């Protein structure tokens, strides 16, 4: 299996690989030779701790040069890299770490105390390596890693090398580990990067959290081409513009909610920063409204906006090119290179008609589709139809072959680029002693695209306020999953079979929004 990082470390050793810019002059640059050495030291450290091929190393922390290193180190050691969302509560994190059977954890110092508190409940976790600060008692630190050789570890077995596992919640509310095995030189990936126009000379800015498949995947593509990657630790709109200006950024991947923040800055603030270098704004994670597209195109080069549709499990499935952004508003584009898309109706028949009156569940076939849900074969099989796989989105196709996502079969909410699954929140809310049942769904939000809303049925005689519900949620859920608003009802609308009619609940909020409720 070719190790592109090692190749670039030899062919362009002095080229900047990672620029970790935290603002205020706090900047650390690693060349390709330095990134290779750091990844090798960490890979050798993992091997020294008994990590064998196919074992899991979970990493946790905001965007940083160390995150870039650990992803490569895991691959070099033949391990499976598992990103952990650092915004999860301890109980949520515990489930992921335990379920993936992690052997080693690589954690930034800020989140090391959470791992220390959970350590006694994680019998399969052998050791924790802490970076960027002093480790708690019983854990290892940067000095441990620094003592290892900068030469590559023994070559990993091809079966496991380059594998990743990213957790994505499902309709049960429990996260599922989507495993994708390494496929160097995959034709679909190469075709996508070629279509978008990636070049080795690009300066790529990563600002979305790298524990997500989109930011992590496109950063991986940039690294595979030998680009320079600028890392923003956490998104801040003006700082994002500063980075674009300072480094003459030409490519980036972002959620619409983040770009809305940047484009909504006062004109005098935006005027301080040069933006003409941007050639490829790759957008995903939520639909772009026509108004936001127009706002973006007024602030950035008009041929720079690329919209992609995909998921953690299925990779990139459709692409809307710059020339179609205003011509095809609401579309997610045509199938990406190497991707075959089909629509099936509820009876399992393929939908051949076009237009909004002919929707179907969207299935794809591609070499970039994930390989399994870890320990969840039944869930994996249930989402397949032969060689085609679905995540439950409902779509239609127009006469020119462009696809439009019109509903989410599983009611997933996308708020600020974060995937939120109502079943998980409902399960938490219904633990409140005053709540009889709850229905959670997304409502329009100018700031976040969608906001989490809960409709709650109180228990008879119970006294319950909106603040009570929100406070309880904050205690048990990550902040982005907490409902932003709450309404109360005597009962929830249901079908004849007893299923809650969330479409009925959503409809008043989405009226006039141009989207199917």
Where are these regions (language model features)?
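A short helix-loop-beta submotif of the ANL/AMP-binding
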Residues: 56, 62-82, 86-90, 98-104, ...
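AMP-binding/adenylate-forming catalytic core of the ANL superfamily
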Residues: 67, 88, 94, 105-107, ...
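Gly/Ser/Thr-rich phosphate-binding loop
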Residues: 166, 224, 250-253, 263-328, ...
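Conserved AMP-binding A3 loop
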Residues: 29-33, 163-187
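Structural core segment of the AMP-binding/adenylate-forming
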Residues: 6, 48-49, 72, 76-147, ...
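Conserved pre-ATP/AMP-binding loop-to-beta segment of ANL
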Residues: 13-16, 135-136, 146-167, 174, ...
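Conserved AMP-binding/adenylate-forming core of the ANL superfamily
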Residues: 14, 18-64, 68-72, 89-94
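Conserved AMP-binding/adenylation subdomain of ANL enzymes
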Residues: 186-203, 207, 211-251, 265
């Amino acid at each position: 299996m070719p190790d592109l990082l090692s190749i670039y470390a030899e062919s362009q050793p002095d080229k900047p690989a990672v620029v970790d810019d935290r603002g205020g002059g706090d900047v650390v640059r690693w060349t390709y030779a330095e990134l290779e050495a750091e990844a090798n030291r960490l890979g050798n450290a993992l091997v020294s701790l008994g990590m064998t091929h196919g074992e899991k190393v979970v990493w946790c922390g905001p965007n940083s040069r160390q995150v870039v290193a650990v992803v490569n180190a895991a691959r070099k050691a033949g391990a499976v890299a598992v990103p952990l969302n650092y915004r999860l509560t301890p109980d949520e994190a515990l489930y992921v770490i335990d379920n993936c059977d992690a052997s080693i954890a690589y954690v930034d110092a800020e989140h090391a105390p959470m791992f220390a508190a959970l350590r006694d409940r994680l019998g399969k976790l052998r050791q924790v390596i802490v970076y960027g600060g002093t480790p708690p008692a019983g854990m290892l630190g940067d000095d441990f890693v620094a003592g290892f050789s900068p030469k590559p570890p023994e070559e990993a077995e091809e079966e496991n090398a380059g594998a990743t596992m990213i957790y994505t919640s499902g309709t049960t509310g429990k996260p599922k580990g989507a495993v994708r095995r390494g496929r160097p030189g995959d034709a679909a990936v190469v075709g996508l990067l070629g279509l978008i126009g990636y070049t080795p000379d690009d300066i790529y800015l990563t600002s979305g959290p790298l524990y997500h498949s989109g930011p992590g995947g496109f950063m991986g593509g940039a690294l595979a081409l030998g680009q320079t990657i600028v890392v923003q630790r956490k998104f801040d709109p003006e700082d994002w513009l500063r980075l674009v200006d300072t480094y003459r950024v030409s490519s980036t991947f972002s959620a619409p909610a983040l770009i809305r923040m940047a484009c909504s800055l006062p004109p005098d603030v935006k005027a301080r920063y040069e933006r003409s270098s941007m050639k490829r704004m790759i957008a995903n994670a939520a639909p772009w409204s026509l108004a936001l597209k127009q706002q973006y195109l007024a602030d950035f080069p008009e041929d720079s906006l690329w919209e992609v549709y995909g998921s953690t499990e299925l990779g990139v499935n459709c692409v809307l090119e710059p020339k179609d952004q205003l011509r095809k508003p609401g579309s997610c584009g045509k199938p990406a290179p190497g991707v075959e898309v089909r629509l099936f109706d509820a009876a399992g028949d393929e939908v051949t008609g076009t237009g909004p009156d002919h929707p179907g569940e969207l299935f794809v076939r591609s070499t970039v589709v994930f390989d399994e849900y870890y320990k969840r074969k039944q869930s994996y099989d249930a989402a397949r139809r032969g060689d085609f796989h679905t995540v439950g989105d409902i779509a239609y196709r127009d006469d020119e072959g462009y696809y439009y996502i019109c509903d989410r079969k599983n009611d997933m909410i996308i708020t600020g680029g974060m995937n939120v699954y109502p079943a998980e929140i409902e399960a938490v809310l219904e633990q409140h002693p005053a709540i009889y049942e709850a229905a959670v769904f997304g409502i329009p939000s100018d700031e976040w695209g969608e906001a989490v809303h809960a409709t709650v049925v109180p228990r008879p005689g119970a006294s319950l306020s909106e603040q009570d519900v929100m406070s309880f949620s904050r205690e048990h859920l990550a902040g982005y999953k907490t409902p932003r608003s709450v309404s109360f009802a005597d009962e929830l609308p249901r079908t004849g079979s007893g299923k809650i009619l969330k479409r009925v609940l959503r409809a008043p909020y989405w009226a006039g929004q141009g989207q199917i409720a």
